[in-house]
Amino acid sequence: DLMLLCLEMLREDSACLKRWQAQFRYILVDEFQDISPVQYEIVRLLAAPENNLFIVGDDDQSIYGFRGASPESMMRFLTDYRAAEQILLDVNYRCHEDIVNAAGRVIAENRNRLEKNILAAHREGEGIALYTCANEEELRKNLLESLLQEQRNGRLTRCAMICRTNFACGLWAQVLHGAGIPYVMREK
């Protein structure tokens, strides 16, 4: 693995480490919650001895555990760099208050996280609907019924569907096409 070899080289060859440390006066890491322990150690070595390290991340948004990412890196950073200033961006400008509050209640159940209370910039909303489905077929039926109702009410343009995989998008495209519901598919 390239990262392991890189880490090994930086640990064992002090001249190499010094050369690379001299290359970077400042280091910025975005999406820090998605780095692995090996990547954390590489960044830590490169940032030394100046420790001019700027990280951006949200431990509640870590989604790459299957790739070795560890949101605990956020907590470790606060321990390893006690002099670092922490700036909390605690206002959500994308979603209305009902969504932010519901998400906050779900996320609060995470056992290992940095404490934070996110507020919504947009107060008014139409609430959220929660469906509990026994299986995929029931999910498709309920969602399709909701979309058809939105279409009848002339509000289909307010709807969006986010799928985790391209395969799921393909299945939903077939369902929507079969029901006569117009849609546009985009990546990202």
Model-predicted regions and their roles:
Residues 1-76, 91-95:
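Conserved helicase NTPase motor core
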